[in-house]
A protein has these predicted regions:
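N-terminal periplasmic "start-of-domain" segments of outer-membrane beta-barrel proteins
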Residues: 2-33, 92
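N-terminal periplasmic accessory domains that precede
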Residues: 38-41, 68-71, 100-102, 126-147, ...
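Short acidic/polar hinge/loop motifs at secondary-structure boundaries
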Residues: 87-116
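Short loop/turn motifs that connect adjacent beta-strands in outer-membrane beta-barrel proteins
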Residues: 139-142, 171-174, 289-292, 391-397, ...
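C-terminal beta-barrel architecture of Gram-negative outer-membrane proteins
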Residues: 615, 786, 790-884, 899
Length: 939
């Protein structure tokens, strides 16, 4: 009997059944979906959680626009390991392990195996939630052409695809060479082209009023408008279309918006970003002789994506930090010289706010002259794997080398150079009254005064001077080497012992380098330095399958399974993963399986080495405030030992005292932590497989029922600032004191001992967990004149929780859509039906997403009882019809979202909202009914 290798084990066995829960999507499933990207199909599977990055949620990301990732069990993309032919694939996200599915040619895939549950012992780090193993086609002979075109009912979201796959096999059938070329194009979907998102809006929900959650306040325009908003001492004003001064009226007349002076950002935003892809792939198997051979896999993917959001919103505090006073005049040789570009109306209504002898003002303005903020991303991924495999004295062996590289070049427009803008804002009249920049050196460098007052007031020369094009260059490199052997050791009465063992080496490097202005925080944003890092790991593993009993009453077969992997990381040192399980075949029709596993995830490069990026937190409470010099508790002692606190106490009668400026003067940095340890996950799965061959009607049916539970107690999270403060001073935990920097002495109006920096860094202080049941059922057979196949997959989620810190209460997310964009319905299901009758074929896919409540923490903050505000369930139906013109030619027509089911109104301000879409586009279809037609030709 031929033995096969299935995801979840490295030991080939006669039965293609995994010891852990496994679901398989075939190439026929991919073809019936009409999907141009694998994520579109995978997200229909109920084991999948909310992806961190997709085409419909990445418009506002600073990088990774158009990337598509997967997230098993809602435990995070970084805890789902994506493999290609059982081997790792280079990441598509800098500093992370998440694979961009755009880089894998959909039409070159034979099947996708979804293994849920911890699998780090078998495959290494990151497989805490499970594994997505993408198996490419092999031994294909001939030519296959597939082309399609389609668009949405609204005339957008157009897509085009052409894919050519070819293969040739040697005369003896032992060697094969395959190639693939693919091109796909998916168009943009603009927020303004869907009624629900055409206007800026926000939820009307407020304290104690749950009934207002899905009532939209429209319009809810931005206070940063293209004509500017200017603040005097007692009023604020703006300009009309003719640049006449008028009062500010942000949203206009209630209900109609008439006379609004605010800005509608939805005119510029996208629901889905456009993505173009070119894909090249090749595989080959060359048999030296019947026992030994070589193989190779090559992939090159080039993708182009573009995000688009509203023009830059500039506030005077972006230019003059921290308070934002803009000088309306200059002191030159002791004389006050007015800026000639400042209107008299404003000049007459301002005073000296900061005591420097110069009148100043404040403003907000939308820099519409700059155009929209647009990021164009070109991403190239290359991967080559090669190796030897064969059989030696009854044992199978394989060795391989893999090299992968992802390069992303991003260029951005619409940003402003803060230093240039500051020079341009500080204008004085020259000898003939013409406005010039005050700073002589700036004038020599081409400074042009800028006028912000009114529509289109910025001249092309001024625009050129203050514009700051942005860039980001990221490079990810992966190198792998490994070898393994597998075979059988005879000797037990119940059969031979299956054994597999191997060694692996891996190197990961990543860098993300923004432009110099972004690094320095001089483009009106926070400083974002480069992030670079690398690590290597050496691993050994061993797996065994031991037959315990065979051909006994109620025991057709009983086997024990065990796997152990030891890793040695250059960053975290030694790691150990293991799993142990039982497979009990009671009868030919009934089988039980159970697995207990410990999986590890080493910290990724971002978590270890993210460079400090500046932030300005609000709402922090200093535990030391009010502590006295005579206090004897741990808090008092810890506070007095902090720099500057004793000085502060001495100046305030022995009590540590802070003022408002101290609270507003806190800055901080978000950074990685090179001292992180690997996180450990424990998983349990217990399952039942039933194939009721004795029942005539069900003899071709397969049923599986699997219970799963996963818990991570030392998860890597970015520690909350308030938690770090409390741990340092209240809990006497010095590890967290390193995140806090105090002023040793008073600086201006900032007190001695006040917090200067409160940082966020990654720590092993979090926790995650999930628990539930998976059910699958499948059947195929003759029905009427044709053949029918049916498959159902359902997941019931009992529990999903996260814990910010070890002593914090668990935040239960099952059945909720949360503030951190996790959508976790208790029930999700997918039903696939396919019928074939002669040359005619039809397939139907129904995807059900159960109801969810709004995040209980969000509702509690509004004094609303948890569970009282819910989003209803949604069912999406996709169909495809095929007609075989002849044996080699097939036409097909498909409709996605057949009944045009609308997404729920998850309005801005509610948890789960994706900016610019007024719903959760990671979960629900925000585009609507879509059509496509295609042609397949095989030769």
């Amino acid at each position: 009997m031929q033995k096969v290798l299935i995801t979840g084990s490295r030991i080939a066995s006669p039965a293609a059944e995994s010891p852990s829960p496994l679901q398989i999507l075939s190439s026929a499933d991919i073809a019936a979906s009409g999907a141009t990207n694998l994520q579109e199909l995978l997200q229909k599977n109920p084991t999948m959680g909310t992806p961190t990055v997709s085409r419909t949620n990445s418009n506002f990301l600073t990088s990774s626009a158009g990337v598509t990732t997967v997230n098993l069990r809602n435990l995070g993309d970084s805890r789902t390991l994506v493999l290609v032919n059982g081997r790792r694939f280079v990441s598509g996200v800098p500093g992370d392990s998440a694979v961009d599915l755009n880089s894998i040619p959909t039409d070159f895939i034979d099947r996708v195996e979804l293994l849920t549950g911890g699998a780090s012992a078998t495959y290494g780090s990151d497989a805490v939630a499970g594994v997505v193993n993408i198996i490419l086609k092999k031994n294909f002979n001939g030519v296959l052409l597939d082309a399609l075109a389609g668009k949405s009912q609204e005339g957008d979201d157009y897509k085009k695809k052409i894919a050519l796959t070819f293969g040739i096999t040697s005369a003896d059938g032992a060697s094969n060479l395959m190639g693939h070329f693919g091109y796909s194009k998916q168009g943009a979907v603009a927020s303004r082209d869907r009624e629900r998102s055409a206007l800026d809006q926000t939820s009307a929900i407020r304290q104690g009023h749950p009934e207002l959650a899905f009532v939209a306040r429209r319009p809810n325009f931005s206070g940063y408008a293209p004509q500017g908003r200017f603040f005097g001492d007692s009023e604020d004003f703006t300009y009309d279309a003719n640049n006449n001064i008028i009062p500010w009226n942000q949203n206009g007349a209630p209900g109609s918006g008439t006379g609004a002076t605010g800005f509608n950002r939805s005119d510029y935003r996208l629901i889905a970003v456009p993505v173009d892809r070119y894909l090249f792939a090749t595989t080959g198997n060359w048999a030296f002789n019947p026992e030994h051979g070589a193989f190779f896999e090559g992939t090159y993917a080039s993708s182009h994506a573009a995000s688009n959001i509203e023009p830059f919103a500039l506030g005077s505090d972006n230019v003059y930090k921290p308070d934002g006073q803009v000088p309306a005049a200059s002191l030159i040789n002791g004389a006050l010289v007015r800026n000639p570009l400042v209107p008299q109306y404003l000049y007459d209504r301002i005073g000296d706010n900061d005591g420097d002898g110069v009148p100043d003002y404040f403003f907000t303005r939308r820099l519409s002259e700059f155009g929209p903020r647009r990021s164009v991303v070109d991403r190239d991924t290359f991967r080559l794997a090669t190796g030897l495999k064969g059989t030696l004295r009854g044992w199978n062996y394989e060795t391989y080398l893999t090299y992968g590289k992802t390069k992303e070049a991003q260029s951005s427009t619409g940003q402003v150079n803060v230093m240039s803008l500051r020079n341009a804002l500080e204008a004085i009249p020259d000898v003939d009254g013409t406005p010039v920049c005050r700073d002589v050196h700036a004038r020599q460098e081409g400074c042009v005064p800028i006028k912000l007052f009114g529509y289109n007031s910025i001249t092309p020369d001024a625009l050129k001077y203050v514009t700051a094009p942005g860039s980001l260059l990221t490079i990810i490199t992966q190198r792998l080497a490994g070898g393994s052997v597998s075979g059988e050791v005879p000797g037990l009465p119940a059969g031979a012992i299956g054994v597999a063992a191997g060694v692996e080496w891996r190197s990961e490097e990543s860098s993300a380098i923004p432009d110099p202005l972004t690094q320095s925080g001089l483009n009106a944003g926070n400083a974002t330095p480069p992030t670079m890092g690398e690590f290597t790991v050496r691993e050994v593993f061993v797996e065994t399958r031991v037959p315990l009993l065979k051909a006994r009453p109620w025991v057709r077969e009983l086997s024990a399974l065990a796997t152990f992997r030891h890793g040695d990381y250059s960053t975290v040192g030694a790691t150990n993963s293991w799993n142990a399980g039982l497979e009990w075949s009671m009868t030919p029709d009934v089988k039980l399986r159970a697995t207990r596993a410990q999986s590890t995830r080493a910290p990724n490069i971002n978590e270890l080495y993210q460079a400090p990026s500046q932030d300005f937190p609000t709402g922090l409470v200093d535990p030391c405030e009010g502590v006295s010099s005579s206090g004897s508790g741990a808090l008092a002692v810890n506070c007095r030992n902090a720099p500057g606190v004793a000085v502060n106490m001495a100046a305030h009668g022995g009590v540590f005292t802070l003022n408002q400026a101290d609270q507003q003067g806190i800055s901080g940095y978000n950074r990685g932590n090179p001292k992180l340890a690997a996180e450990t996950g424990r998983s349990t799965t217990v399952g039942l497989i039933v194939t009721p061959r004795a029942i005539p009607l069900l003899r071709r049916a397969v049923f599986t029922l699997d219970y799963f539970k996963i818990k991570i107690a030392d998860a890597i999270v970015f520690t909350d600032r308030q938690y770090a403060l409390d741990q340092c001073y209240n809990q006497n935990n010095p590890q967290f004191c390193a995140f806090i920097t105090r002023r040793p002495a008073a600086v201006g109006n900032l007190s001695a001992g006040s917090i200067r920096y409160s940082d966020i860094a990654a720590t092993n202080s979090g926790g995650f967990g999930t628990e539930g049941v998976d059910l699958t059922a499948s059947w195929s057979g003759r029905v009427g004149p044709g053949s029918l196949s049916a498959r159902l997959a359902h997941t019931w989620l009992r529990e999903l929780w996260q814990q910010a810190t070890p002593d914090a209460d668990k935040n239960h997310d099952a059945g909720e859509v949360t503030a951190n964009n996790v959508n976790a319905p208790r029930n999700r299901a997918t039903l696939n039906l396919a019928y074939k009758w002669g040359p005619y074929g039809a397939s139907w896919t129904s995807t059900y997403t159960g109801p969810v409540s709004l995040d209980d923490q969000f509702l509690k903050s509004l004094s609303i009882a948890p569970g009282t505000v819910s989003v209803g369930s949604r069912t999406y139906n996709d169909v495809q019809f095929t007609y075989d013109v002849r044996k080699a030619i097939q036409l097909y027509l498909g409709v996605d979202n057949l009944f045009n089911a609308k997404p729920p109104p998850i309005i801005s301000g509610l948890p789960g909202n994706q900016t610019g879409t007024e719903t959760d586009t990671s979960t629900y279809d925000a585009i609507g009914r879509r059509f496509y037609v295609g042609l397949r030709v095989s030769l």
